[in-house]
Amino acid sequence: MRLGRKKQATKFPQRMVNLIISGGLLLALSINIAACARKDVSELVTRKPNFVLEEFFSGNSVAFGIFEDRFGNLRRQFKVNLSGKLDGNRLVLDEEFLYDDGERASRVWTIDRLGLNAAGLVSFQGKADDVKLAAQGTQAGNALNWQYDISLEMSGMNLNVHFDDWIYKQDEDVAINRAFVTKFGVEIGSVTIVFIRGKTASTLWPLSLDEWPSG
């Protein structure tokens, strides 16, 4: 899932803004990006262990993550408490975040399992206050791919960006999330998150979100 935000656009560093508004750089990079499209989730249909989104996130879980710019520079760190409630084909997932600069944030996802798509893969639709329209997700094998647009606040400017969001289940209680952030088809950053649930998370949940560790 995506890193949470307050019910407002999210703040990002000035360097990121300069990268995005640099027209010459956008033009040069767009050619490379077009040639390096990521795989389709259907290619992972034989991967194990099988990932069932609503089962994995039902109950309490925790997460640890980082945000990097497109050059691989670490920009932010964060940790998350998650609580999921399943009602039929609908999962309501409450996320509470703490960032390393002390910012607190939250998001509530409402995720509906839609059934099988034309390719025979399980599809989902997700909604949250700061996600434009609805996120569209497809699950195959050990993976889930989300596609959605979101508004980020970057040095005083609101910028609409796209997220290509991938979750890979590693074992019963662990999944890894990689999300790629693009603007005009150009990658401007990425997010890496480790989700921990079940018995593995029972000794960690809830994480302290009062302040970021200083030592």
Where in this protein do the model-derived segments appear?
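N-terminal helix-cap/turn-to-beta initiation motif at the start of protein domains
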Residues: L44-N60
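Bacterial N-terminal signal peptides that target proteins for export
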Residues: L3-G24
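Bacterial signal peptide processing site
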Residues: A37-K39
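Central antiparallel beta-sheet cores of small beta-barrel/beta-sandwich binding domains
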Residues: F64, D69-M154
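Low-complexity, acidic/polar, glycine-enriched regions of mature
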Residues: E54, N60, L74-R75, K79, ...
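Glycine-rich, aromatic-bearing surface loops/beta-hairpins
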Residues: D164-G215
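C-terminal motif of bacterial Sec signal peptides marking the signal peptidase cleavage site
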Residues: N32-A35
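A charged, solvent-exposed segment within the mature domains of Sec-exported extracytoplasmic proteins
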Residues: A134-V186
